[in-house]
UniProtKB/Swiss-Prot annotation:
Organism of provenance: Trieres chinensis (Marine centric diatom)
CDD domains with a match to the protein in the record: Ubl_ThiS
Keyword Oxidoreductase assigned: no
Keywords: Chloroplast, Plastid
Lineage: Eukaryota, Sar, Stramenopiles, Ochrophyta, Bacillariophyta
Entry-linked InterPro entries: Beta-grasp_dom_sf, Mopterin_synth/thiamin_S_b, Thi_S, ThiS/MoaD-like
Subcellular location: Plastid, Chloroplast
Family membership noted in the UniProt record: Belongs to the ycf40 family.
Gene transcribed to yield this protein: ycf40
Record bears the keyword Nucleus: no
Gene Ontology, cellular component aspect: chloroplast
Protein name from the UniProt record: Uncharacterized protein ycf40
Length: 73
């Protein structure tokens, strides 16, 4: 009998990651210690509103781009 893996592959800024957990965008950003007030998130080629982050679950082959806002002078 062959065991089927339930691991999901997803990409953050082009870097490949794996998870076997069910996780939403909000929790994923917390896991990676991103300051959510200073970033823009693109999820599968669409800009994602912060109010939806807790509703969107990571799926296999999702592509997430995170752009952080940096101030300076």
């Amino acid at each position: 009998m062959t065991k089927i893996s339930t691991a999901k592959t997803f990409f953050i800024n082009g870097q490949e990651y794996y998870t076997t957990n069910t996780i939403n965008l909000h929790d994923l950003l917390n896991y990676f210690d991103f300051n959510s007030s200073l970033l823009v998130l693109e999820y599968n080629n669409f800009i994602c509103n912060k109010k939806n982050w807790e509703k969107i679950m990571i799926s296999n082959n999702d592509k997430i781009e995170i752009v952080t806002i940096v101030g300076g002078g």
